[in-house]
Amino acid sequence: MRYLFVVLFTLVLRIVHGQVNPEDVEIIRDSYGVPHIYGKTDADTAYGLAWAHAEDDFVTIQKAYLAGNGILSRWNGKQGVGADFIAQFIQSEHTVDRLYHTLSNEFIAVLQGYTEGLNSYAKHNPDEVLLSSLFPITPKKLLIYSQLQLFLSNEGDRFVEAIISDRVVPYKKPIEEDVRGSNLIALSSRKTGTNESFLAINTHQPLEGPTSWYEAHLVSEEGTNIIGATFPGAPCILTGANEYLGWTHTVNYPDKADVFQLEMKNKTTYIVDGEAHQLVKKKAKMYVRFFGMRIPVSKVFYESIYGPTLRNKAGVFAVRTPSTTNINALEQWWRMNKARSFSEFYSYLEWNALPGYNIGYADRNDTIFYISNGKIPKRDSSYDWRKVVPGDTKKTLWNSYYTTQELPQVIAPKSGYVYNANHSPFFSTAPDENPNPDEFAKAMNFETYNNNRSTRLFDLLSEKDTLTYEDFKRIKYDHSLPTPLNYNYVDFNAIFEMNPDDYPDVADLLMDIQNWDRVASADSYGAGAFAVLYYTLGKYYFKLGPSKVFNKLLIYTCLKDAKKHLLKHFKTTSIRLGDFQKLVRGEKE
């Protein structure tokens, strides 16, 4: 990638105290506004990253830290209550205090540099501070926030919300969730036919908020030279490339969180293997606003040997996820930033601190690699871990984890390619080199499905023996759906078998979709019709049988809903995708 460097400013600030000397930090922004940050030490570059990111989006960083430290509702009232409760429910502060000694001194210096950068920015820009009690930000506050993010990434919050709502298993909303997804592709010289390896980093994150990407380039005299992206509040790059290698992530969905129903003897005593245990009562404190006044509210939860615990009308339930068992994920990412070879990179994966995420990798030595990574518990196979499991026996109380070597992975395949699109790790390269699902415990519950994107990716990657860089870019920017459609959660293909003459009141809409070339281009009328139709499916999804097949009659109902929506909002049944789906930033679209 070619950069045109335009020096907008050089940062020189002076502070009396602290580990970092700001005179050793230089921030140069290129023509896109991306900060290129130079420092003598990694702590220097972390300081510069914090300052640059704060210049661009200090509000989001603060809101993230407020939520992670359980005080967001002090600033925004009831909107922050949910995040504050979960942050206190998982007791991150206690976890960080207990495990802080497991961090290296080198990484603690990075954390100190980053938090010094935020504190210095706040000191020089007091009008931008949302809540003064958040400051000074410390390395521990940073880590406490990261614990919340990782718990959310393991979908632990869904179980908490379900239990509070007097359910146990969270509702799945695949129609809505399928609009989110990421893709990774890595090609070695076996596939490129040249002395080159290609890596596509195509993660899809929100444009705003605590999980929106922030691009940066970090350089230090301690061996760091990496460009990539990070989340607000993180002190290092989370996906990117250095001079030697690059990696990216997509979200994976093995079983990363469990719910246990406790056997209660009375309101405060539960029984495990015939032995009585006492629930430890805890209280989360949040705030709401009433006529401008900040009113404290509280919610009781408990601690059991299974983890943080809640009571609802159905019983007492504990939520347990590996993300809360260590605080080393950020240091693992930081070490990955500095890796110079596949063996070194893999050795950091063996820390087993990241609770999840697929990883796609390529390096200058022509090694490509894929792994469905995660801290996956070793569970008793006699239980169905997709459901609530009994919390009355230590047979279900897992405390050990599969090693990195025991996870589904592909290293340097003969096919010359690996890929993932939030689908099964058992379809990650050529068919004869895929991981064998029979070699992995069913209780790990790895995905076994393909989806539209993975189906299309495989078709494109396997259609030619070698792929040029132009081919690679064409695949990366491909907007086509496969034939037949391959949604992993529903079969909608009956729409292409419907005779428009049999449905005259929606014939125009049906023909637009049936004549569509499956390319989701902004100017496509077929794509526009299909997109509107797609968003009508959600309310009917839970009416489907186990096969999850939309029959013609139900599709007809959805088509009528789509037509009604189009006429109401667009005054026509024929619109382009770009009329319905737009990227809007301020006054630009």
Q: What does each model-found stretch correspond to?
A:
Residues 1-20:
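Bacterial Sec-dependent N-terminal signal peptides
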Residues 20-223, 227-236, 322:
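Substrate-recognition/specificity elements adjacent to catalytic centers across diverse enzyme folds
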Residues 104-105, 117, 121, 180-186, ...:
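Short alpha-helical segments and helix-capping/turn motifs at coil-helix boundaries
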Residues 331-357, 364, 437-492:
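Proteins synthesized as precursors that undergo proteolytic processing into mature forms
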Residues 354-464, 537:
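Hydrophobic alpha-helical segments
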